[in-house]
């Protein structure tokens, strides 16, 4: 157990590089610079276009509390797929 604790402490100490060879006095800010410099992204960030809302007409009056029969469920799925097919241009 002690060996595992020692190994984890050594790996954590090795993971934090401390710059050496700085001329003049060094402040704690220079020695322990934990935050990387802020670099602007190479490609500009464009907002992604929002998908348009498509009104999907149901083939029958739909009550969310009613139980769908297999034929009604198939008709609903077919109607939705036909609407999406027309929107996607296939």
From Swiss-Prot:
Residues 1-15 form the signal peptide. Its main location: secreted. Restricted to tooth and associated tissues. Localised to the junctional epithelium at the cell-tooth interface. It is found in: Secreted. Keywords: Secreted, Signal. One of its GO terms (cellular component) is extracellular region. Tooth-associated epithelia protein that may participate in structuring the basal lamina at cell-tooth interface. This is Secretory calcium-binding phosphoprotein proline-glutamine-rich protein 1. It comes from Rattus norvegicus.
């Amino acid at each position: 157990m002690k060996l595992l604790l020692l190994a984890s402490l050594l790996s954590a100490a090795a993971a934090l590089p401390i710059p050496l060879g700085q001329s003049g006095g060094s402040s704690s800010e220079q020695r322990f610079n934990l935050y990387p410099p802020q670099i602007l992204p190479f490609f500009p960030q464009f907002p992604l276009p929002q998908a348009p809302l498509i009104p999907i007409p149901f083939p029958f009056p739909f009550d969310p509390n009613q139980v769908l029969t297999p034929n009604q469920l198939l008709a609903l799925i077919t109607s939705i797929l036909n609407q999406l097919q027309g929107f996607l241009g296939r």
